[in-house]
């Protein structure tokens, strides 16, 4: 259930009403909703909004559902401030911690050849970094650098002892990998292109793609245009997927956007290598 509103009382009433409707629907189908396994996460920035957030509550029958500071959803840790510290670097279950554990496990392949080590490292390191990257890619640079350190350690392991003094560019090129920032640009832009091309998922498409009312250069190049109600002043909004997708998609040439998907992917990767610095 998603209820966007600034008034905590309105949010509480709407959420409680939604909960009652779901409870009635489940009871009519001989199912039971468990309030102990229903969680409440209220997103807000800093300042007054953060104070108002504490007033939100949900009445679930005789029980009162209390707010959570963070919750795990589809493998990602969502924090009520919209920040990604806990997911990327904050604890045993963070991405950095998991990557460090996987790097230790890779040492068992020390005697394997380059191809074997590259295949395994791509599967266990690269895939972990890439998962949900369009979502958390707006995280501060110091968090992204922590991921970049782990990626370079994996690349150095794959390339062997002779790569100890190699540059970052040479390491990544030898492995055929993009840096974390380059991957973030690539995956976010690719997802934006799929949304624009297929009009799916419909919710994101209607939010992100508004028709150009005037034939401008942005219109002819197929750039994403938000509606007039969109506001991008807050820090949380500027780091969001939609904001970054619009900004990245505007950077690539219009000629790329009309290519078949396979060609688009190839040229987008080349564009990322040329234009996004390795950080």
Q: What are these language model-derived features?
A:
Residues 7, 28, 36, 127-144, ...:
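Charged boundary/loop elements
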Residues 11, 17, 24, 28-69:
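Short, conserved micro-motifs composed of acidic
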Residues 23-41, 48, 72, 143-210:
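Short, charged alpha-helical motifs in flexible N/C-terminal segments and linkers
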Residues 202-244:
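Amphipathic alpha-helical
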Residues 6-13, 82-94, 109-119, 137-147, ...:
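Conserved, non-catalytic sequence blocks in retroelement Pol enzymes and Pol-derived host proteins
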Residues 1-3:
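Short beta-strand->loop micro-motif that forms the acidic, two-metal-ion catalytic signature
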Residues 64-135:
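Basic, alpha-helical interaction scaffolds
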């Amino acid at each position: 259930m998603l209820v966007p509103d600034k008034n905590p009382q309105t949010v509480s009433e709407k959420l409680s009403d939604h909960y009652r409707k779901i409870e009635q629907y489940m009871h009519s189908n001989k199912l039971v909703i468990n309030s102990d396994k229903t969680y409440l996460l209220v997103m807000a920035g800093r300042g007054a909004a953060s104070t108002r957030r504490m007033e939100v509550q949900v009445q679930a029958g005789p029980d009162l559902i209390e707010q959570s500071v963070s919750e795990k959803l589809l493998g990602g840790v969502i924090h009520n401030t919209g920040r990604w510290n806990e997911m990327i670097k904050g604890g045993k279950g963070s991405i950095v911690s998991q990557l460090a554990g996987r790097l230790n496990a890779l040492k068992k392949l020390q005697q394997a050849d380059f191809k074997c080590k590259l295949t395994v490292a791509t599967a266990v390191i690269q895939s972990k970094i890439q998962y949900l990257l369009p979502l958390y890619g707006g995280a501060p640079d110091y968090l992204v650098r922590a991921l970049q350190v782990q990626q370079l350690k994996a690349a150095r392991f794959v390339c062997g002892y002779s790569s100890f003094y190699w540059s970052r560019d040479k390491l990544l090129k030898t492995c055929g990998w993009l840096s974390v920032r380059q991957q973030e640009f690539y995956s976010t832009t690719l997802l934006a292109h799929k949304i624009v091309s297929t009009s799916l998922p419909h919710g994101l498409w209607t939010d992100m793609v508004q028709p150009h009312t005037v034939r401008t250069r942005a219109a002819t190049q197929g750039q994403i245009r938000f509606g007039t109600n969109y506001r991008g002043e807050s820090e949380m909004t500027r780091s969001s997927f939609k904001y970054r997708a619009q900004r990245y998609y505007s950077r690539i040439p219009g000629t790329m956007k009309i290519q078949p998907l396979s060609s688009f992917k190839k040229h987008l990767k080349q564009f990322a290598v040329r234009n996004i610095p390795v950080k």
